[in-house]
C-alpha cells in the first residue's frame, strides 16, 4: 500500500508540474494592466500565424510569446486609399480609405473617453515586412451576428443594454462606414467588445444615425463634453489627419447637443445612467 501510495504521489506531483505553467499564464493574463499588454504586443516574439477566413480584411491570428506568457493577437495590415469605391449598397464613396491605422486611432480615442475597456488594446507593429495593427486576442464566445442567429438572450438585459448604448455612442463618434454585427464580440458572461475600425473616421460632420443615440453613460457623457481637439490630435498623430480630427470633434458636438436636448425633454434620469 505504501509503494502504491508513493507512486500515486509521484504521479500527482508530475501532473501538477505539467499543468502549473498554464495556470500561471492564465493567472498572469488576468492581472496584466493595459500598459503591460501594450508592452507585450510590441515586444513579444511572434512564433506563428494563421490567416482568418472571417471578415472582409481577413486578419491574421498570430501567437506571441515573451518566454513567460504566450498569447494570441490579431494582425491587420490593410491600408487602401482609392479615389472612389462603389459600396455594397450601391453608394459611391469618394476618397475611400480602409486602413489599419484607424484601429489604433479608435483605441486612442476610446482611452480619452473612458471606453478602452470595451476595445482590445491596439498597437502598431510590423510582420513579414508589413506594418499593421496588432490587438490582444479576446476570449470571445460569439459575435452579435451569432447571438441573434441563435436567439440567445443576455443573462442581464439591463447590463447588456447599458453596454450597447456605449457602443452606439462610440460608433456615432467615429463614423464607421462598415459597422456590422460581426464586429461586436461577446464573452461567456456577455461582456461586449467592439473591434475592427478600418473603415471608420470618415470626414462627415453629421452623425451616421442619430436615432442610435438613446441613452448615455454619465461618465462617458462628461468625458465627451471635455474631449479636447489638441489632445486628440496629439494622441492620434500619424493615424488621423487634421480633417479627421475636426470631423470627430464636430460629431462630438452633435452627440453632446442631442443628449442635452433629450435631457431637457425627458429628464436626466431617462437619458443618463
Task: List each model region and its residues.
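Helix-centric, low-specificity signal for extended rod-like, repetitive segments
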Residues: 1-3, 244-245
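Phosphate/dinucleotide-binding and metal-coordinating scaffold of catalytic cores
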Residues: 25-273
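Bacterial N-terminal signal peptides that target proteins for export
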Residues: 2-12
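Bacterial N-terminal signal peptides
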Residues: 12-21
Amino acid at each position: 500500500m505504501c509503494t502504491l501510495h508513493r507512486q500515486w504521489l509521484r504521479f500527482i506531483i508530475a501532473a501538477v508540474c505539467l499543468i502549473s505553467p498554464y495556470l500561471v499564464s492564465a493567472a498572469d493574463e488576468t492581472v496584466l494592466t493595459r500598459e503591460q499588454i501594450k508592452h507585450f504586443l510590441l515586444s513579444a516574439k511572434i512564433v506563428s500565424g494563421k490567416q482568418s477566413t472571417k471578415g472582409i480584411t481577413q486578419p491574421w491570428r498570430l501567437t506571441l510569446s515573451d518566454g513567460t506568457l504566450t498569447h494570441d493577437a490579431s494582425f491587420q495590415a490593410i491600408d487602401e486609399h482609392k479615389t472612389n469605391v462603389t459600396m455594397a449598397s450601391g453608394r459611391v464613396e469618394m476618397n475611400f480609405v480602409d486602413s489599419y491605422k484607424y484601429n489604433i486611432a479608435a483605441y486612442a480615442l476610446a482611452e480619452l473617453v473612458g471606453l478602452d475597456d470595451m476595445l482590445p488594446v491596439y498597437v502598431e507593429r510590423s510582420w513579414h515586412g508589413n506594418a499593421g495593427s496588432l490587438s490582444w486576442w479576446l476570449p470571445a464566445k460569439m459575435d452579435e451576428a451569432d447571438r441573434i442567429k441563435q436567439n440567445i438572450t443576455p443573462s442581464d438585459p439591463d447590463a447588456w443594454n447599458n453596454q450597447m448604448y456605449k457602443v452606439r455612442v462610440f460608433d456615432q463618434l467615429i463614423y464607421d462606414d462598415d459597422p456590422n454585427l460581426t464586429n461586436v464580440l461577446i464573452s461567456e458572461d456577455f461582456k461586449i467588445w467592439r473591434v475592427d475600425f478600418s473603415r471608420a473616421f470618415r470626414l462627415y460632420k453629421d452623425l451616421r444615425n442619430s436615432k442610435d443615440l438613446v441613452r448615455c453613460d454619465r461618465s462617458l457623457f462628461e468625458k465627451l463634453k471635455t474631449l479636447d481637439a489638441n489632445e486628440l490630435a496629439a494622441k492620434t498623430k500619424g493615424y488621423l489627419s487634421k480633417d479627421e480630427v475636426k470631423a470627430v470633434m464636430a460629431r462630438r458636438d452633435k452627440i453632446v447637443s442631442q443628449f442635452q436636448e433629450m435631457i431637457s425633454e425627458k429628464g436626466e434620469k431617462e437619458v443618463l445612467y
